[in-house]
From Swiss-Prot:
Residues 1-22 are annotated as: Disordered. It comes from Lactobacillus helveticus. It comes from the Bacteria. The lineage of its organism: Bacteria, Bacillati, Bacillota, Bacilli, Lactobacillales. This is Uncharacterized protein in hlv 3'region.
Length: 22
């Protein structure tokens, strides 16, 4: 599932709008 949380591609807490994959 795609969780709409502020994460980057590596799963680090950033201020960017990314989705947590896996």
């Amino acid at each position: 599932m795609h969780n709409s949380i502020a994460y980057d591609k590596d799963g680090n807490s950033t201020g960017q709008k990314y989705y947590a994959y896996g």
